[in-house]
Amino acid sequence: MKTLNKIVLGTLSLCTLLFASCDNYLTVEPKATIDEDLAMSEPDKMVTAAYARLGDDWYTYPFNMWPYGDITSDDAYKGGSGTTDTNYHPFEVWSSLTSSSPDHMDEMWYHLYCAISRCNRALVSLAEHGDKLDAETRKIREGEVRFLRAHFYFKLAQIWNQVPWIDEEVYRNHTEEKTRNDANTHEELMLKIVDDFKFAYDNLPASQAEGGRANKIAAAAYLAKCYLTMAWGDGYEATTGADHINPAYMQKVIEYTDVVAGSGYGYLEDFGDIFLPEYKNSKESIFAVQHSDYKDDNTKYGRANWSNMLNGCWGMWSCGWDFHKPSQNLVNAFKTEGGLPMFEHYNDKIDYPVNGAPTAQKWDPRLFHTVGMPTFPYKYEAEYTMTKDNSRTPNTYGYYASLKEVPQRSKGETFDNPWQAFAMNDYVLRYTDVMLMRAEAMVEIGNLEGARSIVNDIRQRAKNSVAKHISYAADQCEIALYPASDFGTKEDARLRVQWERRLELAMENERFFDLRRWGIASQTLNKFFEVEKNSVYDGQTYAQYYNDAHFTPAKNEYFPLPYIQLFYVPGLYTQNKGY
């Protein structure tokens, strides 16, 4: 108590001294600050500031959402030095997920709303000072900002479902702390997001001179994604899935993917090229978060991709921390029989290819572009062949590494200490993703042959993606196109489209959201936990933490609102059900 009194008295004495002398400093203008009125008077710069938030993230709040979309699923393990490395472990087991654990959820919430605040300020700036721009440019910039705001809100809705809708009017009226998160149903919130994307679609050009800006085609693709999300239900398994299809929304998916299919975007010729930095902003890339190397933009470290800063392979990169690890179940999913997936029996036996030792078991070529495996070149470079030493904790997270989010090792990092960071763009929407959305909708409205045609186009590209980058695995690859008989019923077609989506988009942070949309998350994940905890690689077991894993429907479909957000304004927000 004496110590506390001394601290208080000392603080009061210091305050007296400060107040006695503060008159000398009150008239001094602060340095290195931004005059808000001046900033708001420059609408074009305010729009640029909103764009800047796209890549303004960190591993504790990665806007590409790899912890939320992948390590929560059957595609990936968390990785790292063990289950306590970062606070993401509850995501991979679900059973220990609470409103305060992991605390990274609060960072994600906060930074997504910071991004939305940027957008709202830009919209106010355009409304009040837009006459500094010509009429056409002003409308385009407004379309871009509303696209960005919808993009950030879509992420919030994906994670939490019930979130407060704070737009420029709420910002103007300073009513943020009076805006409830349960004011809108799932559908009402999604339709507000749709309204923003629709404004962008109606007012943006089909192409922009500056790479990285949103355009009409990106808005069409996002509209398709929104309508596809709504078409299956509200996300909770009791009211989601094949028995809850909204045909009108599925037709909207067809309508907007028609626009994408008729645009100048398309499939890159080789699957591997999609994930090489020299092909960023290619015809495959409809919208991507832009990143750069310091050698390109003349800055100290470049505009690095900090979302993936932990996801480099252990021992391969100077600071690769070995997070975001492909699962054995995912590797098994690439098995083929007669060139087609082994739907019923793919996971009966734990298997993996070994370089130079082909067996009767063949694999979809996309495996070798997606998963780094011991004995194989790391991202196509023989001088950087992976070994078992390239896994940080194989007794916990196995021996595989993710390849898509990293460049080739010879290209180096743009930042290398104490973490590595790369100049890889982050795809938000790529052409193949959108075409698979189209195939999904075609199945549900009864155009099974149209869906088969899309899937076979994608598989043909995969078949053609061996010689250029993975010739060393040619004797282990086998892939075939689907005959019409494989798409004979809606159930058969649905299975094949969903499987194709898993193979094509593996490790691209969408898997859990796909499972939830289809209404099959609990059955898929609880079966995965039961099998995966017994996985053995080269005689060694791992993934024992899945003994404690369980996905609870009517609860885990969405994440809990962060406790800190509930605490800030008690009674304003309603927690998601089950938490």
Predicted regions, residues:
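Hydrophobic, small-residue-rich alpha-helical packing segments that form membrane-like cores
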Residues: 167-279
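Bacterial Sec-dependent N-terminal signal peptides
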Residues: 3, 17-42, 193, 224, ...
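Bacterial N-terminal signal peptides
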Residues: 10-18
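Bacterial N-terminal signal peptides that target proteins for export
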Residues: 1-11
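Conserved, well-structured interaction surfaces
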Residues: 40, 44-48, 52-57, 82-160, ...
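Membrane-proximal, proline-rich intrinsically disordered regions
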Residues: 22-72, 558, 562-579
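Long, intrinsically disordered, low-complexity segments
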Residues: 25, 43, 99, 112-115, ...
